[in-house]
A protein has these predicted regions:
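Generic structural signal for small/hydrophobic residues in well-ordered secondary structure
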Residues: 47, 107-110, 180
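Short, glycine/charge-rich flexible loops or terminal/linker lids adjacent to PRPP-binding catalytic cores
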Residues: 55-106, 112-123
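Alpha-helix termini
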Residues: 15-25, 51-56, 91-98, 126-140
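Active-site-facing substrate-recognition patch
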Residues: 1-29
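Gly/Ser/Thr-rich loops at beta-strand to alpha-helix junctions
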Residues: 34-42, 113-116
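A structural signal for isolated positions on well-ordered beta-strands in alpha/beta enzyme cores
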Residues: 32-34, 62, 106, 144-148
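PRPP-dependent phosphoribosyltransferase catalytic core
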Residues: 8, 15, 123-208
Length: 208
């Protein structure tokens, strides 16, 4: 059975999000944050607070939805776990001034596991932006992409991050199952259990 790690929301906010926010700020400069609506909303929302520049507007957050393991209507058993399915995507026909052209786009997710969904997101967003550039003058400003993940699992990945895409992991971890507090129905109970598990782990280490 795979091991599981659990962290409190406060620890993730202070140790993993705030610690890397300064480096991301050098890149962002009023970027747009794109996140998975299920797994990336909490870290994206907290990061936006940390990256807020006094006197400026909030950084816009836009959502994309990708599913790898969820059984969805019109999907086959063979697709689950092997094929990335779009459940929500940007509507470039209605974005107007919110277009990604000429922007710095930070893609936010909880965990970089196999990198199937994250690699898909980067590739497809870059393709969409390239299509937009075909309709613009040759001197249109470039779009830059970067990625922030709360945890990067140290394991073999299904794809490589392009060299022109900056990558900001909050923490590097072994291939463990991560139990995030914002995915729990009772976040207070989750925090209590996470603290108990930490004390138990410390006790086990001391006995060794």
């Amino acid at each position: 059975m795979a091991q599981m790690i659990g962290e409190t929301a406060a620890k993730i906010k202070d140790d993993l999000l705030l610690s890397v926010a300064g480096e991301i700020l050098k890149f962002v400069q009023l970027a747009r944050i794109t996140k998975d609506p299920r797994s990336g909303f909490f870290p994206a929302r907290v990061l936006r607070t940390f990256l807020k520049i006094q006197g400026s507007k909030n950084i816009p957050i836009q959502a994309i939805g990708l599913s790898l393991y969820e059984e969805l209507p019109n999907t086959t058993v063979e697709q689950v776990g092997t094929e990335v399915i779009r459940t929500q995507w940007l509507d470039f026909s209605t974005l107007g001034e919110k277009s990604l052209v000429g922007k710095r786009v930070l893609i936010v997710d909880e965990v970089d596991d196999t990198r199937k969904t994250l690699g898909y997101a980067v590739k497809e967003l870059q393709k969409d932006v390239e299509e937009q550039y075909k309709l613009l003058p040759a001197d249109a400003p470039p779009t830059e992409f970067a990625i922030f993940v709360v945890h990067n699992k140290l394991k073999e990945k299904a794809s490589e991050i392009p060299t022109n895409v900056k990558y900001f992991p909050g923490a590097e971890i072994d291939d463990l199952w991560v139990d995030y507090p914002w995915e729990q129905q009772d976040i207070v109970e989750h925090t209590r259990l996470a603290e108990e598990d930490k004390k138990k782990h410390v006790g086990d280490v001391n006995r060794e």
